[in-house]
Amino acid sequence: MHSPPRDQAAIMLWKLVENVKYEDIYEDRHDGVPSHSSRLSQLGSVSQGPYSSAPPLSHTPSSDFQPPYFPPPYQPLPYHQSQDPYSHVNDPYSLNPLHQPQQHPWGQRQRQEVGSEAGSLLPQPRAALPQLSGLDPRRDYHSVRRPDVLLHSAHHGLDAGMGDSLSLHGLGHPGMEDVQSVEDANNSGMNLLDQSVIKKVPVPPKSVTSLMMNKDGFLGGMSVNTGEVFCSVPGRLSLLSSTSKYKVTVGEVQRRLSPPECLNASLLGGVLRRAKSKNGGRSLRERLEKIGLNLPAGRRKAANVTLLTSLVEGEAVHLARDFGYICETEFPAKAVSEYLNRQHTDPSDLHSRKNMLLATKQLCKEFTDLLAQDRTPIGNSRPSPILEPGIQSCLTHFSLITHGFGAPAICAALTALQNYLTEALKGMDKMFLNNTTTNRHTSGEGPGSKTGDKEEKHRK
């Protein structure tokens, strides 16, 4: 008796299921308004036993995501989308949870689709997709990790005011780009940022880099014995058979920590030949603090590292002294002067060339005398300055960069030049004598000379 109404009910439910399925597909293509909320109460009866032959009600999204459909005359916006349209839901550092007020419906839809329930047919709002289409795909927003902002806001919810303040116009927040730029700058080598860090980082009040030594050996109000031996360092340039150690004083360590070098713990440990260890930098800083020197953690060097940076002052001065000895004794000044003098044998040019050699010798002497008056502290010596503070500070800068090697090495090279000039002047004097003798012989052989008169008397 009841079969016709039951068949009619089954047919109506079947049509309802078909309509819901196609309307959901249509809604995925169109950004429409949900209109099936009134029919959700009827979907539960479809999954009953007598109607098990009905097709599954779960909607599986296709792998190829279709961009949102815009009816004519509107054109689709340039849209960059990944293969998986819902991959951003599981990404804790994605910007979608932060900039979409519809975060809870998105999460609800994900849970419904994973569970393959009939409730997955509930349409979800797509209003955020046109906004996300304007994002710059070249920006790497995942490098800025702020889980405390991106995650906690989802749990507590976003009200209207917070949603407005966290809209898409705030994507260009300077803090995000600054973090990335600072990280990139830290991985680079010696660049402009390395120099700016030293100038801008607040220096502790007891830092050595901001304090200068005075005459009494006091450093920033603390009594520091600059002549005290800090450690002994084996030489780097000596042979194994003649290895020598050089004493490093507290004053030398202070000069390495001060401008212009401002060495950090790693470079200072290399200069002092300290073995690398897990807590090597910490132990070095603690030892320096005991003698009144402060080495801030994480500081950056201010000057480029050269081969002279690895030498202690004792070895640098030793190298300059050996170089001066070789320039004094082994430089072929006489051979070079004779070779160059042979290229200028014109008698008319001898006088002017001799004047040029004398002027050059005088200039070299003045320059050497200036360098000899340099009173930069070296080792445990603290000589009193002779030159004016302006020129002395410039010479001190050069000496600190070269660890005391620069000025003695230049003086040694100028000594070799002076020896060449001396030998060249001696050669010029010999050339003058030879020319004078030649002129005399030439004048003696002519008529009217004393030699010619004697020969005529002898003939008579």
Swiss-Prot record:
Q: Where in the cell is it found?
A: Nucleus
Tell me a Gene Ontology molecular-function term this record carries: chromatin binding
Q: Where is this region: Disordered?
A: 30-139, 435-460
Give the UniProt entry's GO cellular component terms.
Answer: chromatin; nucleoplasm; nucleus
Which biological process annotations from GO are given for this protein?
A: aorta morphogenesis; collecting duct development; distal tubule development; ductus arteriosus closure; fat cell differentiation; forelimb morphogenesis; glucose metabolic process; hindlimb morphogenesis
Task: PTM Phosphoserine: list the residues.
Answer: 258
Q: Which Pfam families match?
A: TF_AP-2
Which regions are flagged for Basic and acidic residues bias? 451-460
Which keywords does the record carry?
Activator, Disease variant, DNA-binding, Isopeptide bond, Nucleus, Phosphoprotein, Transcription, Transcription regulation, Ubl conjugation
Stretches of Low complexity bias are at 121-132
The record describes its post-translational modification as: Sumoylated on Lys-21; which inhibits transcriptional activity.
Please verify whether the record's keywords include Transmembrane helix.
no
Covalent cross-link Glycyl lysine isopeptide (Lys-Gly) (interchain with G-Cter in SUMO) as placed by the record, residue numbers: 21
Does the keyword field hold tRNA-binding?
A: no
Q: What is its main location?
A: nucleus
Q: What segments bear the compositional bias annotation Polar residues?
A: 35-51
Q: Which domain of life is it from?
A: Eukaryota
Family (UniProt) = Belongs to the AP-2 family.
Any idea what job this protein has? Answer: Sequence-specific DNA-binding protein that interacts with inducible viral and cellular enhancer elements to regulate transcription of selected genes. AP-2 factors bind to the consensus sequence 5'-GCCNNNGGC-3' and activate genes involved in a large spectrum of important biological functions including proper eye, face, body wall, limb and neural tube development. They also suppress a number of genes including MCAM/MUC18, C/EBP alpha and MYC. AP-2-beta appears to be required for normal face and limb development and for proper terminal differentiation and function of renal tubular epithelia.
Subunit and partners: Binds DNA as a dimer. Can form homodimers or heterodimers with other AP-2 family members. Interacts with CITED4. Interacts with UBE2I. Interacts with KCTD1; this interaction represses transcription activation. Interacts with CITED2 (via C-terminus); the interaction stimulates TFAP2B-transcriptional activity.
Disease linkage in the record? Char syndrome: An autosomal dominant disorder characterized by patent ductus arteriosus (PDA), facial dysmorphism and hand anomalies.
Protein name per the record: Transcription factor AP-2-beta
Q: Which organism encodes this protein?
A: Homo sapiens (Human)
- List the lineage, top down: Eukaryota, Metazoa, Chordata, Craniata, Vertebrata
